[in-house]
Curated annotation (Swiss-Prot):
Catalytic activities: RNA(n) + a ribonucleoside 5'-triphosphate = RNA(n+1) + diphosphate
Organism encoding this protein: Bacillus cereus (strain ZK / E33L)
SUPFAM superfamilies in UniProt: beta and beta-prime subunits of DNA dependent RNA-polymerase
Binding site for Mg(2+): D449, D451, D453
CDD domains in UniProt: RNAP_beta'_C, RNAP_beta'_N
Gene Ontology terms: cellular component: DNA-directed RNA polymerase complex
Function, as annotated: DNA-dependent RNA polymerase catalyzes the transcription of DNA into RNA using the four ribonucleoside triphosphates as substrates.
Catalytic EC class: transferase
Single GO BP term: DNA-templated transcription
Gene: rpoC
Needed cofactors: Mg(2+); Zn(2+)
Oligomeric and partner information: The RNAP catalytic core consists of 2 alpha, 1 beta, 1 beta' and 1 omega subunit. When a sigma factor is associated with the core the holoenzyme is formed, which can initiate transcription.
Family, as annotated: Belongs to the RNA polymerase beta' chain family.
Protein name (database record): DNA-directed RNA polymerase subunit beta'
């Protein structure tokens, strides 16, 4: 079978009039659509069956031929071909225009392509095309210039003076004549000469013209094709007309627009035949031009054509643009069959890989499978009776459904799908009711809760799709978060609380110091009330089934609690017995202090020891990560299920509740508030005496109240009983934190007003005491602003993710090793003295570029190109090594992607990244998904200049869009020493003395200096506080410095908010922003100066001329913001579906661009498999080979080694 979708590239260009005629099946001559009485299409009209094909399958217009046997017959009465009705989706017609008409995209776009080709201004073009002025097309032997504009009056005067020696005309015909006269080769040569001398604006104009002319010359498009002689008419099914219930018709706007064109065209033909006066003809031509403009892009010029109710009509361009356009609505996202959605409820008894599917939904989703099975089992004679059985829901259907559903995973998706964990696969189990049951542990990944959330179900149909869902998407496989490689399935809320309660210790609990021969005996004692879960007891170590105990330890007693015995039973045997929440206990073994000799006085030893802290959420997360590291996926998911069950069971048994009596108001609160008030009064006194400024007074008042709140918070936390239910909830990490507590029992503290400025009157009451009316009113500001911000933030963050995905969607792991000799030198990221991201975090899962040696002993810690694991990273960090040279995406040489070595470990699996992994999209999701957690606006802590640097989401946008930052820092362009800091008028100037020259920098008013005289400074370093503009930095330094700066800044924003993201994700994005260069001098290559080129294209062009011994081109690297970078991509399909659709398509058509279909988006658009993952060619060409016994033996050996 021929594969329709197997084409290599897609090309777009201008259509010549002949090409348009060759597409067409006939000319549309009349504006009629459908006859209102017979409801049949009118002949030669917009829905004509003769042109576009029959309305009913195998039936001509007049009914002479019906049935499939006349296939291909053309009816002799009505001229309709007997064929399928769906040809009405593909057959085009055309309109022969009575006068040439300009295409608005090429005339009106920015820059005007027609204007660039003719070297005329868009204003002049508009005057000619819309019949306001004449243009000289042939000057003859008159003093007139070609392309000179003449008004009506001037034209008449010249006609009288020179007669017919010159030619001038109006409208698109005149422009067409000029376009036909142009000699591309001559113009291009002339412009290339001009470029050698031209400067400033003339140079930019010349570069733009050269680009367009070269495009026409290389693509084989004729410039005159920008003027239309023939207008194509799209197939009628794409602009349908449907009858509504009231007998009225609803029609697509395009039909109205086509009707206006046909009416005006026919009227113009008639006027020309009649030989009407030129002024009438001109007016009609202008109206035809406007009608065609409206059809192609309504509203681009002048007022849009409106339909009933003053609604602008949707033209052809609008059909492509925006979220509702063809690209984003129908090509990039389609609605699919075999899907359903319902409300979710919790399924606490499900296994990690299961979900509960409502019976009726499952029956509908798996209908075809059930039908096939019914027929195969002989329960139904044919498909039709099987279908009837299902529709009547007969009892035998359910048994068949059960068997069909086994081993057939389904996909569950929750919107918004912010990262790849928003769609996971589960094995369905049938449940009663109409709600989908979801495993509680996957809620974190979906960000789901059960307050009415809904989820969608999709069924993978083919066996390949099922296999992929099972192997790659099963919930039990997705334990780690792709953004940081930490477990994403940590228990939350009840589960945390239950495990916390289970591992509590309590001094003097019932039965303290009892000794048991094994865990069962201890449990028996607990069930009969002799001991409590929290009782500290001793158990014979030999009876605790743990492989990490030494022989000596096994002969001793283990001090623990009954709860911890229960808790440790969920862990694998070879895992240490966890008795205290410390890393050494987790990673190595149970500390020796918990083992005592048999016969020792157990009660005394226990009584002399402090209580050990219970296991909070963080510890549970560490346990999961450690288990995952040692035992891989299956064991981890089993352990998670056991942990979940324990948590639910014991949070139920604990019966932890919250009552008003649990909130005890602090006694010393009034005293602290009095002290603070006295300090505030003192500050106000100082201000009134003029000792301090208004700003200082404000800042001091704010800090006094903040400190008072902190003191209250500290004392409150100390005074709390460790058994206080609210404390237990917050301490375990189940719900709430210290600040909630302070607000309940201490004081609410300072609030911000709607503009973000902090109100200096604090709220002194707590919720327990109750607020005054004024305090309540002040509180509402903050609450309302919080809600408004959240709504805005979600939209902003979603748009950021969309732009990130778009710029990185074609970054795929393409090869094993690119063989680069460059690397990235990394150290810990610091802000002042605070470490934002440690060297350890940056090293794990990367390949070393150069050998790392111990600074003192010289011993090799990491060899070149070796993977740095957690253990190696610890050793490197502890050895005192400050910087390491690693392989990085920044320095990778792979085209259209990265290689395995430069990318390093895949964070989502903890193993090497596979060739075909779509790392670009994963990077975009990892950066975009936490976007909603970042704060929105800058907080103003009073008007201290320089402190208002942007943070949170706006800062991330600023970085990725490469905008000039707010509060920009001045940077030094040279290496040198700060020679002096001078005061000039009301500003300061910094003089930097280099080896050769001195530079003077004016410091903006209000900026704070970072340097002092005599200090050494290197180029690209800041002289003042603030953010550096990356574009400036690129001018002064090199690409590496800019890459490192952007990486550091992004990490700063996220880490400050407590969000961890792997460096490699940011690296992938930043690399995409720096992949273009701007050609400054073309040398002897055929690239054009001033154009943006991909680095690889540029090096290829240079390599070609260097081999011939010619002069290579030179270029500067360019930093593009992500929006700009997406639009500059080589793929026009990807760019057009992103933003500015018409501009991208206009440009691509003129250049005759080829889309090589390398990225993911382009392939989704044309309906091919994406070239990533199993869609890559190297995986598609796999053949099945019969295995022999020898192969089996080899494979078994390999498997054995891996264990």
């Amino acid at each position: 079978m021929i594969d329709v979708n197997n084409f290599e590239y897609m090309k777009i260009g201008l259509a010549s009039p002949d090409k348009i005629r060759s597409w067409s099946y006939g000319e549309v001559k009349k504006p009629e659509t459908i006859n209102y009485r017979t409801l049949k299409p009118e002949k030669d009209g917009l829905f004509c069956e003769r042109i576009f094909g029959p309305q009913k399958d195998w039936e001509c217009h007049c009914g002479k031929y019906k049935r499939v046997r006349y296939k291909g017959v053309v009816c002799d009465r009505c001229g309709v071909e007997v064929t399928r009705a769906k040809v009405r989706r593909e057959r085009m017609g055309h309109i022969e225009l009575a006068a040439p008409v300009s295409h608005i995209w090429y005339f009106k776009g920015i820059p005007s392509r027609m204007g660039l080709v003719l070297d005329m201004s868009p204003r002049a073009l508009e005057e000619v095309i819309y019949f306001a002025s004449y243009v000289v097309t042939e000057s003859g032997d008159t003093p007139l210039d070609k392309k000179q504009l003449l008004s009506e009056k001037e034209y008449r005067a010249y006609r009288d003076r020179y007669g017919s020696t010159f030619q001038a005309a109006m409208g698109a015909e005149a422009i067409k004549k000029l376009l036909q006269d142009i000699d591309l080769d001559k113009e291009v040569d002339f412009l290339k000469e001009e470029l050698k001398t031209a400067q400033g604006q003339r140079r930019t104009r010349a570069i733009k013209r050269l680009e367009v002319l070269e495009a026409f010359r290389n693509s084989g498009n004729e410039p005159s094709w920008m003027i239309l002689d023939v207008l194509p008419v799209i197939p009628p099914e794409l602009r349908p007309m449907v009858q509504l219930d009231g007998g009225r018709f609803a029609t697509s706007d395009l039909n109205d627009l086509y009707r206006r064109v046909i009416n005006r065209n026919n009227r113009l033909k008639r006027l020309l035949d009649l030989g009407a006066p030129s002024i009438i003809v001109q007016n009609e031509k202008r109206m035809l031009q406007e009608a065609v403009d409206a059809l192609i892009d309504n509203g681009r010029r002048g007022r849009p054509v409106t339909g009933p109710g003053n609604r602008p009509l949707k033209s052809l361009s609008h059909m492509l643009k925006g979220k509702q356009g063809r690209f984003r609505q129908n090509l990039l996202g389609k609605r699919v069959d075999y899907s359903g959605r319902s409300v979710i409820v919790v399924g606490p008894n499900l296994k990690m890989y299961q979900c509960g599917l409502p019976k009726e939904m499952a029956l509908e989703l798996f209908k075809p499978f059930v039908m096939k099975e019914l027929v195969e089992k002989g329960l139904a004679h044919n498909i039709k009776s099987a279908k009837r059985k299902i529709e009547r829901v007969q009892p035998e259907v359910w048994d068949v459904l059960e068997s069909v559903i086994k081993e057939h995973p389904v996909l569950l998706n929750r919107a918004p799908t912010l990262h790849r964990l928003g769609i996971q696969a589960f094995e369905p189990t049938l449940v009663e009711g109409r709600a989908i049951r979801l495993h509680p542990l996957v809620c974190t990944a979906y960000n789901a809760d059960f307050d009415g959330d809904q989820m969608a179900v999709h069924v993978p149909l083919s066996s390949e799709a099922q296999a992929e869902a099972r192997l790659l998407m099963l919930a039990a496989q997705n334990i780690l978060n792709p953004k940081d490689g930490k477990p994403v399935v940590t228990p939350s809320q009840d589960m945390v609380l239950g495990n916390y309660y289970l591992t509590l210790e309590r001094e003097g609990a019932i039965g303290e110091g009892m000794v048991f021969k094994d865990a069962n005996e201890a449990l028996l004692a607990y069930q009969n009330g002799y001991v409590h879960l929290h009782t500290r007891v001793a158990v014979a170590a030999s009876a605790v089934n743990n492989a990490t105990f030494t022989e000596e330890q096994k002969s001793m007693l283990l001090l623990t609690t009954v709860g911890k015995l229960i808790f440790n039973e969920i862990l694998p045997e070879s895992f240490p017995y966890i008795n205290e929440p410390t890393n050494s206990n987790l990673e190595k073994e149970t500390p020796a202090k918990y083992f005592v000799e048999k016969g020792a006085n157990i009660k005394e030893i226990i009584a002399s020891r402090e209580e050990v802290a219970p296991f909070s959420k963080k510890i549970l997360g560490n346990i999961i990560a450690e288990v995952f590291k040692r035992f891989k996926i299956t064991e981890t998911s089993r352990m998670l299920d056991r942990m979940k069950n324990l948590g639910f069971k014991y949070s139920t048994k604990a019966g932890i509740t919250v009552g008003v009596s649990d909130i005890l108001v602090l006694g010393e609160k009034d005293e602290i508030l009095h002290e603070a008030q006295a300090k505030v009064d003192n500050v106000i006194k100082q201000f009134r005496r003029g000792l301090i400024t208004e700003e200082e007074r404000y800042d001091r008042v704010i800090s006094i109240w903040s400190n008072a709140k902190d003191v209250i918070q500290g004392k409150l936390m100390k005074s709390l009983n460790k058994r206080n239910p609210i404390f237990m909830m917050s301490d375990s990490g189940a719900r709430g934190n210290a600040s909630n507590f302070t607000q309940l029992a201490g004081m609410r503290g300072l609030m911000a007003n709607p503009s973000g400025r902090i109100i200096e009157l604090p709220i002194k009451s707590s919720f327990r005491e109750g607020l005054t009316v004024l305090e309540y009113f002040i509180s509402t500001h903050g609450a309302r602003k919080g809600l408004a911000d959240t709504a805005l933030k979600t939209a902003d963050s979603g748009y950021l993710t969309r732009r990130l995905v778009d710029v990185a969607q074609d970054v795929i792991v393409r090869e094993d090793d690119c063989g680069t000799d460059r690397g990235l030198l990394i150290g810990a990221i610091k802000e002042g003295n605070e470490v934002i991201e440690s060297l350890y975090d940056r090293l794990v899962g990367r390949f070393a570029r150069k050998t790392v040696k111990h600074p003192e002993t010289g011993e090799v810690l990491v060899a070149e190109n070796q993977l740095i694991t957690e253990d190696i990273a610890h050793i490197v960090e502890n050895s005192g090594v400050e910087t390491v040279n690693i392989r990085s995406a920044f320095t990778c040489n792979t085209r259209h992607g990265v290689c395995k070595k430069c990318y390093g470990r895949n964070l989502a699996t903890g193993t090497d990244v596979e060739v075909g992994e779509a790392v670009g999209i994963i990077a975009a999701q990892s950066i975009g998904e936490p976007g909603t957690q970042l704060t929105m606006r800058t907080f103003h802590t009073g008007g201290v200049a320089g402190d208002d640097i942007t943070q949170g989401l706006p800062r991330i946008q600023e970085i990725f869009e490469a905008r000039n930052p707010k509060g920009q820092a001045v940077i030094s362009e040279i290496d040198g020493v700060i020679a002096a800091i001078n005061d000039v008028k009301d500003r300061q100037e910094v003089v930097v003395q280099g080896e050769v020259e001195a530079r003077t920098y004016a410091i903006p008013y209000g900026a704070r200096l970072k340097v002092i005289p005599g200090q050494k400074i290197s180029h690209g370093k800041e002289l003042t506080e603030g953010s550096i503009d990356p574009k400036e930095l690129l001018k002064v330094t090199d690409i590496t410095a800019v890459q490192e700066y952007l990486l550091r800044e992004v990490q700063k924003v996220y880490r400050m908010q407590g969000v961890e993201i792997g460096d490699k994700h940011v690296e992938v994005m930043v690399r995409q922003m720096l992949r273009k260069v701007r050609v400054s001098d073309a040398g002897e290559t055929d690239v054009l100066p001033g154009t943006l080129l991909d680095i690889h294209q540029f090096t290829d062009a240079n390599a070609k001329v260097l081999l011939q011994g010619k002069q290579p081109a030179t270029a500067r690297p360019v930093l593009l913001g992500i929006t700009k970078a997406s639009l500059e991509t080589d793929s026009f399909l990807s760019a057009a579906s992103f933003q500015e659709t018409t501009r991208v398509l206009t440009d691509a058509a003129i250049k005759g661009k080829r889309d090589e279909l390398l990225g993911l988006k382009e392939n989704v658009i044309i309906g091919k498999l994406v070239p990533a993952g199993t869609g890559m060619n190297r995986y598609r060409k796999v053949d099945l080979v019969k295995t022999t016994q020898d192969d089996m033996n080899v494979e078994n050996d390999e498997v054995y080694v891996e264990q």
